[in-house]
Amino acid sequence: MVTTALNTTKSEEIFSAAQKLMPGGVSSPVRAFKSVGGQPIVFDRVKGSRVWDVDGNEYIDYVGTWGPAICGHANDEVNAALRETLEKGTSFGAPCLKENILAEMVINAVPSIEMVRFVNSGTEACMSVLRLMRAFTGREKIIKFEGCYHGHADMFLVQAGSGVATLGLPDSPGVPKTTTAATLTAPYNDLEAVKKLFAENPGEIAGVILEPVVGNSGFVLPDAGFLEGLREITKEHDALLVFDEVMTGFRISYGGAQEKFGVTPDLTTLGKVIGGGLPVGAYGGRKDIMSMVAPAGPMYQAGTLSGNPLAMTAGIKTLELLQRPGMYGQLETITKKLIDGLLSIAREAGHEVTGGNISGMFGMFFTGEPVRNYEDAKKSDLHKFSRYHRGMLEQGIYLAPSQFEAGFTSLAHTDEDIEKTLAAAKVVLNNL
């Protein structure tokens, strides 16, 4: 059973059958609930801030399909736009006007992006941007940070976060050593470690890629001066700075983390929010760099479904909604109320916790020590988190089934949702 209080018979039956059809019974590892125990619930439908499972149980959702549902699930305006586009076709395999519209919106919003290429996922965006980094600089080595996740491509599965961290894996079998030999790693928030890597590899490093706000080791903020320091170091060594804003883009501010912190990278990857719930990714940056991408330049990258009209439509409408006055203030207010309440309740119940938020992105660790990087995140009491997760599920609150994933609010969450969540947390944390 997933819980003791909920009837999840149908979820169990479906998941049992799924395990005979798909590896682990899921299409993405974290969904299997391995780090929190029990079997996953199977969703039937979603709307606004709520999700319903196949047994009819209703939950307040703080996963938001892992970030894209910033306007709430099945937003009426997004759905209406999709229905209109659907009548014209789902995929053209040729240019469409909606690509221009979304591209212009992205370019106008994100400080670093002068040109953009649409792809089908965040993983694809990061794979492509790595190839571009190497093509532009003529160098092969890159620096990534421990616990930062940039998708499941071979060259990034070194000290990765997200599902890799959830399963307790340092990397993955099947990745050739030669593929990751050029991937250097440093602890997040450690500028001295980055300087050391540049000193040890003079003229060989193409650039640095990172999540400007980490969401795949749990929620970890950059120290004051960290992003600025990376910008200075990369400029000093004629290397590129790349922000993986698949998670933070259009979520923590309309212009992403780079707008929020005032640090402009050379290249940026995007996903999640810009697809409005449909599969999408993008990478973009300075025009002189992006001009190397085929067919304008020699660096090849392509995709059958890239820029398809449905994904473009959902992205356009989502960004239009986010442009309305007060949207990000609303996200900040409601998310701060949530995380401040959770931390207060946990501490009053005698638990050592730390956490925070930035706009509609938040996290809480079961440790009293500050969390500045992946090693700090691993000090969280994972057994306690798993019991907390199961308890909240019983109370009708759906949280990410991993300590190493950030949580998300949406514009559909209400004060009543937050109050119900905090009331549930009080019950769970006082009995943990």
From Swiss-Prot:
Name the cofactor(s) required for activity, per the record.
pyridoxal 5'-phosphate
Catalytic activity, as annotated = (S)-4-amino-5-oxopentanoate = 5-aminolevulinate
Asked if the Swiss-Prot or TrEMBL record annotates the protein with the keyword Transferase, the reply is: no
Q: Which residues carry this modification: N6-(pyridoxal phosphate)lysine?
A: K272
The UniProt entry, under InterPro entries, shows: 4pyrrol_synth_GluAld_NH2Trfase, Aminotrans_3, Aminotrans_3_PPA_site, PyrdxlP-dep_Trfase, PyrdxlP-dep_Trfase_major, PyrdxlP-dep_Trfase_small
Pathway linked to the protein: Porphyrin-containing compound metabolism; protoporphyrin-IX biosynthesis; 5-aminolevulinate from L-glutamyl-tRNA(Glu): step 2/2; Porphyrin-containing compound metabolism; chlorophyll biosynthesis
Q: What is this protein called?
A: Glutamate-1-semialdehyde 2,1-aminomutase
Q: Name one GO cellular component term.
A: cytoplasm
Q: How does it assemble?
A: Homodimer.
Q: What is its EC number?
A: 5.4.3.8
Annotated GO biological process: chlorophyll biosynthetic process; protoporphyrinogen IX biosynthetic process
Alphabetically list the UniProt keywords: Chlorophyll biosynthesis, Cytoplasm, Isomerase, Porphyrin biosynthesis, Pyridoxal phosphate
The answer to whether UniProt assigns keyword Isomerase to this entry is: yes
What top-tier enzyme class does this entry carry? isomerase
State any single GO MF term: pyridoxal phosphate binding
> From what superkingdom does this record's organism come?
Bacteria
Q: Which organism is it from?
A: Picosynechococcus sp. (strain ATCC 27264 / PCC 7002 / PR-6) (Agmenellum quadruplicatum)
Major localization listed first in the record, in broad terms = cytoplasm
